[in-house]
UniProtKB/Swiss-Prot annotation:
GO molecular function terms listed in the Swiss-Prot or TrEMBL record: rRNA binding; structural constituent of ribosome; tRNA binding
Gene: rplE
Task of the protein: This is one of the proteins that bind and probably mediate the attachment of the 5S RNA into the large ribosomal subunit, where it forms part of the central protuberance. In the 70S ribosome it contacts protein S13 of the 30S subunit (bridge B1b), connecting the 2 subunits; this bridge is implicated in subunit movement. Contacts the P site tRNA; the 5S rRNA and some of its associated proteins might help stabilize positioning of ribosome-bound tRNAs.
One GO-annotated biological process of the protein: translation
Keyword vocabulary terms for this entry: Ribonucleoprotein, Ribosomal protein, RNA-binding, rRNA-binding, tRNA-binding
PANTHER family: 60S RIBOSOMAL PROTEIN L11-RELATED (PTHR11994)
Keyword ATP-binding among record annotations: no
Self-association and partners: Part of the 50S ribosomal subunit; part of the 5S rRNA/L5/L18/L25 subcomplex. Contacts the 5S rRNA and the P site tRNA. Forms a bridge to the 30S subunit in the 70S ribosome.
Protein name: Large ribosomal subunit protein uL5
Biological classification of the source: Bacteria, Thermotogati, Deinococcota, Deinococci, Thermales
Family note: Belongs to the universal ribosomal protein uL5 family.
Amino acid sequence: MPLDVALKKKYYDEVRPELIRRFGYQNIWEVPRLEKVVINQGLGEAKEDARILEKASKELALIAGQKPAITRAKKSISNFKLRKGMPIGLRVTLRGDRMWIFLEKLLSVALPRIRDFRGLNPNSFDGRGNYNLGLKEQLIFPEITYDMVDVPRGMDIAVVTTAKTDEEAKALLELLGFPFRK
């Protein structure tokens, strides 16, 4: 049963027709759309204490609405006291309705709660139509209360689109309501 997510409805009712008008697409499948959102949290300190990974995993599951996968070290690096296979982070890939729900929450609740927020950096596109942003703490999400947090942990959020160029991706995200700096 598909959920009625306001941001998804906005994409189909307003954003897609506007993108077709702006870029003159001939085929509906040419129109850029959101493919997935990947949330990554690097936890270098987890190699000493497994409880850190557990706590961070619970927090990320609350934020994303989906249990995160543990990322492990690909190689051993002696300077970092790191062995191959050690858990060093968490990752969640959101698609479909969960992706739309997360983005709606990010845009309407989380980003406005950031102190001194002046807008997202418009230069964080990767050249292939994907957007990356970093958050410094998890407290900006409504599911995380102040009492739950022992250490502020940041995360990287990658918004993957089917757009061919950064210009198309920026137009898509702007129309969806991403607050870019001017």
